[in-house]
């Protein structure tokens, strides 16, 4: 599985971020994980899940970080075996599994930058990328949006 590493410095509001990936297990392990990255599970368990994805042959983790602190990420991997779209074992079908930005770093366009960088490598031309969005992972409470307005935001 071809994985082309990319890195981009991003500046906004006098803050510098690095958007980079796909990261290896060792690269990811050398970074710290923001405690507010809890949309899917507690931060420590989510960090472990990301580390596990890096060990998959097709797994890709891209991060947004400030210094050594991961403040956002996006994951790509083959669909889970329990999902019906995995039944064909199509090597060109990859799932954007998760995207999350810490609450303290939202509205800085980091999610947009993560998507742009991660999908800009030539190898993604050979994939069909799918994603599923479940509203119970959305931050409706802190965004003060209802499901329909949050959907428009997405």
Description of each model-found segment:
Residues 1-52, 56, 61-65:
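Short amphipathic alpha-helix that is part of the acyltransferase structural core
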Residues 40-94, 99:
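A conserved beta-strand-loop-helix scaffold within acyl/acetyltransferase catalytic domains
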Residues 43-48, 112-117, 146-153:
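Well-ordered, non-membrane alpha-helical segments in soluble/globular domains
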Residues 65-69, 120-125:
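Secondary-structure boundary elements
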Residues 89-96, 144-154:
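Glycine-rich, flexible loop segments associated with nucleotide phosphate handling
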Residues 99-104, 133:
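Short strand-loop junctions, especially beta-strand C-caps/beta-turns
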Residues 101, 107-121:
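Conserved acetyl-CoA-binding loop-helix of GNAT-fold acetyltransferases
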Residues 122-149:
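Conserved GNAT acetyl-CoA-binding A-motif
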């Amino acid at each position: 599985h071809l994985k082309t590493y990319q890195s981009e410095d991003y500046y906004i509001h006098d803050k510098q971020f690095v958007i980079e990936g796909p990261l290896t297990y060792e690269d990811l392990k050398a970074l710290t994980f923001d405690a507010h990255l809890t949309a899917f599970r507690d931060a420590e368990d989510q960090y472990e899940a990301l580390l596990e994805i890096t060990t998959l042959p097709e797994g890709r983790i891209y991060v947004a970080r400030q210094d050594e602190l991961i403040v956002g990420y996006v994951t790509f991997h083959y669909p889970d075996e329990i999902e019906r779209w995995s039944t064909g074992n199509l090597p060109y079908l990859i799932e954007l599994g998760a995207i999350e930005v810490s609450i303290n770093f939202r509205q800085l366009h980091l999610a947009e930058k993560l998507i742009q960088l991660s999908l800009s490598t030539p190898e993604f031309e050979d994939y069909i990328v799918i994603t599923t969005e479940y509203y119970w992972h959305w931050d409706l409470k802190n965004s003060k949006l209802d499901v329909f307005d949050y959907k428009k935001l997405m």
